[in-house]
């Protein structure tokens, strides 16, 4: 994997609050190598380590995107949801930002059936098929469509398992991470000081609660994916 320069600036990270971890009582001792200090009862993340692993993650997604690989971005908590959808749309990635349905990847055949149902209902709606049904039946299908859109809207074009999964907040998305581990799908995970850094393929130590910190990390990864996609288009 070729190393590239991604302009990851320590001062910019500090302004985004990337270095603020959780309270010292809520920490995972395995995070010790990624913590540089304690301040007012809060662990401070070593941004040099953050920059190193974020750069490695950018190299990985660039290389994958330049080969036409598919990405899934997962971040379902309120602070991350909008950032995840915007980032994914910008980089033409799949995303889950509302709720992770158990077995979404490990039980892919069921997910595929749900996606087919979702596409069929969308087609019905677009062709005004609901208007030809009794009101009660139409109402049931509209509710079904609304629910499927909420949970599967970000993966509606996904035709198979993703090649790489990017996880925002490992604790929150633990089920998704375990499914990726079970299937051997490479993962990049944003980890705060209460996480286990040994679970994901690349763990990026960073504040996973601050919107600015999540945005900073996603922006770097999305830029690398977009650069990789441009390279793929030029070479194909």
UniProtKB/Swiss-Prot annotation:
GO terms for cellular component: chloroplast; mitochondrial small ribosomal subunit. GO terms for molecular function: structural constituent of ribosome. Keywords: Chloroplast, Plastid, Ribonucleoprotein, Ribosomal protein. This is Small ribosomal subunit protein uS2c. Belongs to the universal ribosomal protein uS2 family. The keyword S-adenosyl-L-methionine does not apply. PROSITE patterns: RIBOSOMAL_S2_1, RIBOSOMAL_S2_2. It holds the Pfam family Ribosomal_S2. Its main location: plastid. GO terms for biological process: translation. It comes from the Eukaryota. InterPro entries: Ribosomal_uS2, Ribosomal_uS2_bac/mit/plastid, Ribosomal_uS2_CS, Ribosomal_uS2_flav_dom_sf. It is found in: Plastid, Chloroplast. Gene3D superfamilies: Glucose-6-phosphate isomerase like protein, domain 1, Helix hairpin bin.
């Amino acid at each position: 994997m070729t190393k590239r320069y991604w302009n990851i600036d320590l001062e910019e990270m500090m302004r985004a609050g990337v270095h603020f971890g959780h309270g010292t009582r809520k920490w995972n001792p395995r995070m010790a190598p990624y913590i540089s200090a304690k301040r007012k009862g809060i662990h401070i993340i070593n941004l040099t380590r953050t920059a190193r692993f974020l750069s490695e993650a950018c190299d990985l997604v660039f290389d994958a995107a330049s080969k036409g690989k598919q990405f899934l971005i997962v971040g379902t908590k309120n602070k991350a949801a909008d950032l995840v959808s915007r980032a994914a749309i910008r980089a033409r990635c799949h995303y889950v930002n509302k709720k992770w349905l158990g077995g979404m990847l490990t039980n892919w055949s069921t997910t595929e059936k749900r996606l087919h149902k979702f596409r069929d209902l969308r087609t019905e709606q677009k062709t005004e098929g609901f208007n030809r049904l009794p009101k009660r039946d139409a109402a049931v299908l509209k509710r079904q469509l609304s629910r499927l859109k909420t949970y599967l809207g970000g993966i509606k074009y996904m035709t198979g398992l993703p090649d790489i999964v990017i996880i925002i907040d490992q604790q929150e998305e633990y089920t998704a991470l375990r499914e990726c581990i079970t299937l051997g799908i490479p993962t990049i995970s944003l980890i705060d000081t209460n996480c286990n850094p040994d679970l994901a393929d690349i763990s990026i130590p960073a504040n996973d609660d601050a919107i600015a910190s999540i945005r900073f990390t996603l922006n770097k990864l999305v830029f690398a994916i977009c650069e990789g996609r441009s390279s793929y288009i030029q070479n194909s």
